[in-house]
């Protein structure tokens, strides 16, 4: 096994008067799909000792399509879809809940490097990224993950970031405000070059034997290549439903009416009110993800297995992206169903674009995104290069715009994340008052829904999806709790019944994925053996 730089070059790069991240990589001689690799490296289909914190990030890129049976295709020469990433062995995990933060180091060499700040949740995440020099990072023409912090930011972080200022306390929640792993070894799939690489970004400290560390990386690359060689086709499990709980329809429609009253009184222009469906039973998260990817391929596909919590998602919407000094936000607002034929599909899209309510709401949220980006951008650099495009997904069509700016010299990716969080399309306008009303009207804390899943890269880049079209799976010991959530933007002329139907449409993709695997044995060994009865 050889890495892309020699031992001597690695040692030379590691010479510095401060800790250094030396980037190196090994191309693996394997023929394996990302989900199959994830299953093997997390101990699902191998004897690997699995870490409790793992991730799979994939994408199916946006394409213009009027085909109601397939709005997306794996066009791999665009921004999102070229790469897939598997993280399997992090150095540490950072968990932030309210005013409390915790770092668990899995490698003693990182125990005093990964810290928290004691400020707000974004300050804690910035502090958790070790202060290092970077060596041997290649120039890339596109954004990609080279190691760093990977995880999720719950919507409920708004209490720490914004709502403390107006006297609202964080409610008790089953979820942390943020949970991120520090990853220094990432399996990268390049779907254009058709290669699989193991990318290393270890922190090498002063006085450390860099040559010995290089030898560890070579051994790890050999181990991973062996694990990923000659794997059998992946067999995933299914879903057994025991119970389902959904909030009463009239309760949601009453909340919509109350939100409309706030709009009419001038408190807000728009507010996003969401509702949940909770399903109980047993589910295989890998089977769930596999089905969701088939049913609803999207720009952001993610499977985060973080201890007893799994987040499975197919999000269409960028919260914020920073590549170099280029900041991007992609507000999506405006929804209609897919048609049963190309003609009906186009008709529905045309009606959506002609709807004055949809256009006004979308324009307002684009203005909100411009204001968010402007907070971290150089003066005069904010642009809207794409306005009111129609994007087609498996169950719905959306109106999307793109807002860009040039990152100011005194700002970084963490500042950009704070400035744009939460997305206006998941809160409302003006944001603070809309979030106060959400706190009043929604039945329970949102958790990851409406927050973000993504990463802060070593080199200062970031890419976050808004957590929508997603589900959380909580392992409660004797059963799993699966939570699906969706919201609708409420304005002065909103119809409560129509807004309820919109939330149902937005949940359809995730619920259809569960239905696709329902009845299949949850236990993979049983399924492979052909047993009909499910045991856990």
Swiss-Prot record:
Its cofactor is Mg(2+). Chorismate binds at residues 334-335, 449, 469, 487-489. One of its GO terms (biological process) is L-tryptophan biosynthetic process. Coiled coil: none annotated. It is an enzyme of class 4 (lyase). L-tryptophan binds at residues 59, 299-301. Pfam families: Anth_synt_I_N, Chorismate_bind. Mg(2+) binds at residues 361, 502. Its EC number is 4.1.3.27. It catalyses: chorismate + L-glutamine = anthranilate + pyruvate + L-glutamate + H(+). Binds 1 Mg(2+) ion per subunit. GO terms for molecular function: anthranilate synthase activity; metal ion binding. Keywords: Amino-acid biosynthesis, Aromatic amino acid biosynthesis, Lyase, Magnesium, Metal-binding, Tryptophan biosynthesis. Pathway: Amino-acid biosynthesis; L-tryptophan biosynthesis; L-tryptophan from chorismate: step 1/5. Component I catalyzes the formation of anthranilate using ammonia rather than glutamine, whereas component II provides glutamine amidotransferase activity. Belongs to the anthranilate synthase component I family. Tetramer of two components I and two components II. This is Anthranilate synthase component 1 2. It comes from Haloarcula marismortui (strain ATCC 43049 / DSM 3752 / JCM 8966 / VKM B-1809). The gene is trpE2.
């Amino acid at each position: 096994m050889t890495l892309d730089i020699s031992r001597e070059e690695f040692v030379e790069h590691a010479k510095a008067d401060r800790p250094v991240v030396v980037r190196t990589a090994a191309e693996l001689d394997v023929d394996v799909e990302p989900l199959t690799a994830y299953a093997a490296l997390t101990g699902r289909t191998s004897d690997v000792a699995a870490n409790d914190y793992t991730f799979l990030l994939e994408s199916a890129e946006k394409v213009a399509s009027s085909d109601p049976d397939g709005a997306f295709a794996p066009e791999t020469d665009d921004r999102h879809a070229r790469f897939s990433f598997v993280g399997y062995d992090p150095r540490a995990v950072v968990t932030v809940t309210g005013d409390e933060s915790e770092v668990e180091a899995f490698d003693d060499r990182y125990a005093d490097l990964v810290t928290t700040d004691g400020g707000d949740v974004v300050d804690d995440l910035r502090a958790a990224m070790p202060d290092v020099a970077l060596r041997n990072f290649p120039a890339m023409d596109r954004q990609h993950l080279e190691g760093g912090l990977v995880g999720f930011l719950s919507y409920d972080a708004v209490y720490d970031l914004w709502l403390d200022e107006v006297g609202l306390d964080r409610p008790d929640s089953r979820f942390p405000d943020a949970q991120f792993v520090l990853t220094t070894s990432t399996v990268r799939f390049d779907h254009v070059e058709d290669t699989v690489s193991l990318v290393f970004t270890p922190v090498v400290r002063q006085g450390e034997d860099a040559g010995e560390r290089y030898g560890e990386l070579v051994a790890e690359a050999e181990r991973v290549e062996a694990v990923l060689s000659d794997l059998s086709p992946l067999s995933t499990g299914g879903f057994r439903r025991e119970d389902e709980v959904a909030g009463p329809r009239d309760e949601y429609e009453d909340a919509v009416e109350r939100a409309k009253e706030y709009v009419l009184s001038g408190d807000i222009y728009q507010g996003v009110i969401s509702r949940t469906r909770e399903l109980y039973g047993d589910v295989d998260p890998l089977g769930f993800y596999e089905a969701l990817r088939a049913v609803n391929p999207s720009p952001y596909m993610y499977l985060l297995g973080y201890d007893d919590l799994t987040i499975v998602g197919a999000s269409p919407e960028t919260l914020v992206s920073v590549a170099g000094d280029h900041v991007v936000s992609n507000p999506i607002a405006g929804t209609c169903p897919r048609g049963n034929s190309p003609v009906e599909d186009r008709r529905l899209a045309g009606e959506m674009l002609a709807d004055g309510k949809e256009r006004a709401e979308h324009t307002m949220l684009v203005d909100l995104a411009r204001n968010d980006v402007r907070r971290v951008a150089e003066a005069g650099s904010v642009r809207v290069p794409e306005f009111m495009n129609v994007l087609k997904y498996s169950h719905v069509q959306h109106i999307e715009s793109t807002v860009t700016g040039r990152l100011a010299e005194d700002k970084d990716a963490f500042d950009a994340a704070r400035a744009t969080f939460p997305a206006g399309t998941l809160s409302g306008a003006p944001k603070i008052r809309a979030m106060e009303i959400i706190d009043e009207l929604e039945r329970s804390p949102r958790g990851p829904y409406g927050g973000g899943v993504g990463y802060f890269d070593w080199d200062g880049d970031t890419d976050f999806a808004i957590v929508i079209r997603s589900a959380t799976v909580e392992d409660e010991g004797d059963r799993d709790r699966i939570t699906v959530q969706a919201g609708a933007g409420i304005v002065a002329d909103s119809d409560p019944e129509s807004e309820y139907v919109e939330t149902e449409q937005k949940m359809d993709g995730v619920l259809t994925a569960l239905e696709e695997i329902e009845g299949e044995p949850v236990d993979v060994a049983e399924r492979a053996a052909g047993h009909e009865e499910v045991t856990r």
